[in-house]
């Protein structure tokens, strides 16, 4: 089966590419920068240039493709912004999929997006869901909370480096999930008819707020975190200020999203039906404690080896003094 992965260089996209290749699928990746995506080619995927903001590039990329897996979203630094990539680009992609008679379209949205229409990214995700449902295409929509992998840069690395961890004064509890597990559910949906034209939450086994994660990282790393709390009022001011400048529109959109995640909400959902339909045991998914334990064990072991090598070099150089 031939699959086109969009957003393949991202955190989730690259894991889906690797997992799909491991399972024997033919994988093609739509990328804007062939050089930055070279690692995907080394894994065995085929690369084709394309850009969601340029609809004419989509039809050639879909030739010979049976399934679209769309993990793409605009980045905070992307000048095109959420409207160009996440709205116009998605509509163009859905139209192209209809024209090429794609057999299945898998889309990743955000859990509870329909509850936050005031946030541009949330509103656009909800609109895209509706466009897909009304398209006549066979679809599966997964609604996500967050990835384990994103917690490394946000918490683990600064704690190890004795740098500041920035959090807000209030914190949402989020049921993060490992992208390896998300990829497993994604690929399983390709062979289960029960997943056709359905929307599923994909969340971890428990919710974590910032304080919980920091405490876990401190325990596993043996380090004390340097924490700075940012008042939500500051985020609101920053967002309102950014809106005055065209170059700040995308920043303002992201700050609006951050503001939602900073309030005392719960981003979680029952997975009982999902596990049953996908025939996957909940105990087979990775928990955050295990994920971070493996990360810190690997990093601390490497740091110990480096320190040992440096100590040995110093002893050797002292012999010649």
Swiss-Prot record:
At the top level, the lineage of the source is Eukaryota
Sorted alphabetically, the Gene Ontology cellular component annotations on this record are: cyanelle; photosystem II
Q: Where in the cell is it found?
A: Plastid, Cyanelle
Main location, first listed in the record:
plastid
Molecular function (GO) terms for this protein are: oxidoreductase activity
What EC number(s) is this enzyme filed under?
A: 1.-.-.-
Gene designation: ycf39
Q: What is this protein called?
A: Photosystem II assembly factor Ycf39
The record's annotation in InterPro entries points to: HCF244-like, NAD(P)-bd_dom_sf, NmrA-like
What is this organism's lineage? Eukaryota, Glaucocystophyceae, Cyanophoraceae, Cyanophora
Its GO biological process annotations read: photosynthesis
Say which family it is in: Belongs to the NmrA-type oxidoreductase family. Ycf39 subfamily.
Which Pfam family, any one of them, does this sequence belong to?
A: NmrA
Q: What does this protein do?
A: Involved in assembly of photosystem II.
